[in-house]
């Protein structure tokens, strides 16, 4: 290991993998990636096998194993948050669902002063650069065809998927061929980061192919304990590996630790709310009260049904069948283990006052919780549902100068009347769809929440008890102009306001969370950041039309 690098990237997760690969494309750049977790070994079935996605969570070999402080509006429940502590970060342990969000998300990002380069037209070319979309035709102007992230469409060929899509139509919605294309609104097959029966993590797609370069070095099990400074200029980092402390210098340091670790390290380094830092004996370096604030996440629940016909994937949870399923995957990369099973779903508006979808549905032809707890039924299916734009906000604060002490954080789920109202709408919409005739041949009755949950108050009480994080923490170091006191990162450079040689590139800089899973937007931001950091001309914006309710015909872009 050298004593000095041009760039040190803290975190070998989703954003860090993109940055390590792209920045080291310039042979003149010496790049060091520091990852606190271990490597994502190619033989590790719990990472590489798509259907094993439920097993890394809660396992210290893969997961930081975070949890919130008691959520004040969920009867004091602590909500567990799995975050990838392994090369590839959360892209090595997530559900592999690829969703860009709605184009209007980026139109809203671009509205504040200084944010105009973040509209959909400016983001679209970076989405396309990262994608290799096997489910799109070569002339599809919305999708990329030559990027490192290989995407499988569907296939959603289990009969329960088609019945669910048809039920959505019967409930008054539409089918869409591609939720990442012209029209997000509607029901249809999803893209997943699965190729040839194997997970496509950011590290597998970006970092591993680049690691043969002499100017890129990746250190795993390297826990960064502090940033080093001369005044307000970052000069390098100190990290611990195998019990030994190392200090390395850099022209620039890039934080890509994610929405929990990046604000934590900033606060440990004296960058945050001055009063809070002083209370812990940390001398403030710069007062940035937005560090750790504006914290957003998606909360979700499972609406589960028993299935009357033996067509669900429920038998695959039988431990007696797992060895055969595993051998099918090991020797052929096929069978039940070769899919994440989140092969379809939909996006809808919960009422006519909403301009674009505010509810997301993931459909599963199986009834099982994310922790592996299966429903009491021989066969079953479920939808994961939750509001996408909750106006509840949380915060993250370190509670010690010790970098190994986990920070306190809370999301304040269900803290506003608007949030609660959307939750009631979400459950009613889900029940309406699941109660349609298209599902009658399979519908063996609701398991969860169950028929005893009917009134608005009962629904909210159930969400308090049963809601889980969708694992989309974001916005804790949000970007915005320096004139915005609560912004942390400059939107044109990703540099931390008031600091030199320090940038943040990960989910924490999102100004608002997007509609859907957030891994794709994080990759997009990292692709764009890499061009900015390298001094390259940004990709030209692509101004193409996309579906907007009330502007286009209600059936525009749909399929039968």
UniProtKB/Swiss-Prot annotation:
Which residues are catalytic? 472
Which pathway does this polypeptide act in? Amine and polyamine biosynthesis; betaine biosynthesis via choline pathway; betaine aldehyde from choline (cytochrome c reductase route): step 1/1
Gene Ontology terms describing biological process: glycine betaine biosynthetic process from choline
Q: Which InterPro entries match?
A: BetA, FAD/NAD-bd_sf, GMC_OxRdtase, GMC_OxRdtase_N, GMC_OxRtase_C
**Catalytic class of the enzyme:** oxidoreductase
Q: What is its EC number?
A: 1.1.99.1, 1.2.1.8
State the Pfam families in the record.
Answer: GMC_oxred_C, GMC_oxred_N
Q: Which GO terms describe its molecular function?
A: betaine-aldehyde dehydrogenase (NAD+) activity; choline dehydrogenase activity; flavin adenine dinucleotide binding
Alphabetized UniProt keyword annotations: FAD, Flavoprotein, NAD, Oxidoreductase
GO cellular component terms?
Answer: membrane
Q: Where does FAD bind?
A: 6-35
Q: Does the keyword NAD apply?
A: yes
Q: Which PROSITE patterns match?
A: GMC_OXRED_1 (PS00623), GMC_OXRED_2 (PS00624)
Catalytic activity field: choline + A = betaine aldehyde + AH2; betaine aldehyde + NAD(+) + H2O = glycine betaine + NADH + 2 H(+)
Q: What cofactors are annotated for this protein?
A: FAD
What PANTHER family does the database record attribute to this sequence? CHOLINE DEHYDROGENASE, MITOCHONDRIAL, GLUCOSE-METHANOL-CHOLINE GMC OXIDOREDUCTASE
What family does this chain come from, according to its entry? Answer: Belongs to the GMC oxidoreductase family.
Question: Per its database record, what is this protein's job?
Answer: Involved in the biosynthesis of the osmoprotectant glycine betaine. Catalyzes the oxidation of choline to betaine aldehyde and betaine aldehyde to glycine betaine at the same rate.
Q: Which HAMAP family match?
A: Choline_dehydrogen
Q: Tell me what this protein is called.
A: Oxygen-dependent choline dehydrogenase
Q: What's the encoding gene here?
A: betA
